[in-house]
Amino acid sequence: TVPTHMEEGEYDAEILPYKYTAHVTVDGRPLNLYAKVKTKFELQTWNATHRIQVGASWTYAKNLGDGQVYDLSRPLNPGSSYTRPRKYSDIPASEQIALFVEDQIGIPIGKHHLEVQAGIGSSMLLNLNSRYALSGKPYFDPRINAQWSFPAIGIGNNDLNINVSGGFGWLTKTPTLAQLYPNKLYMDFVQLNYWNANPDYKRMNLRTYIVDPVNYNLKAARNFKWEVRLGMEFHRNDFSITYFRERMSSGFRSMAN
């Protein structure tokens, strides 16, 4: 038997035949839009050269398809009744705006050279219901990287170049559409199960409850990372060693009730 209803209430289940042929069509019609603007300019302050980038981007993703289309009375997997078909077009679009500014600074210090790259990015999800904790909330991801290059050391006919670098920064990951808009759960409880050798007398009656697992309190996952690196270059051979540490104290996962 399989349920064929889409609403809460009491219904008779469909009695499946011993053999049947199931057909399914997956209708997906994705629409993806992307726009980006970026500008670069340079300026000089004392003996430092600044290469500055400023930009913004906008992304939009929507599926206009019908999703899985099949006869509910002839399912591919009759043992799976917790979900029902859902149109892709019923899922709201994913829309995000992002801004960034970055300054790459080059500073000669005697025969040494210091390169600093500092920037901050900001992103925010759009098209969210006001009940979501993420609605209208921007996240900021600052980051800094620096590299100190020492004077070249002559060894034979080649130079040994040594540099030390390090950096730290934040990275924000927002929930996916599947996490923001999960499928509803259908809880079908058998109220009556009468089995008879005569198919005309067989009957199963169900009481169905629908659970909406949407979590409006979802927040973005934040990841902090820092690293230090020693690099060497000699006669077209590169060697480097890096130590890094990454810490993420938040994230997403599915939990069964």
PLM-predicted stretches and their roles:
Residues R247-N257:
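Surface-exposed, extracytoplasmic segments of Gram-negative outer-membrane nutrient-acquisition systems
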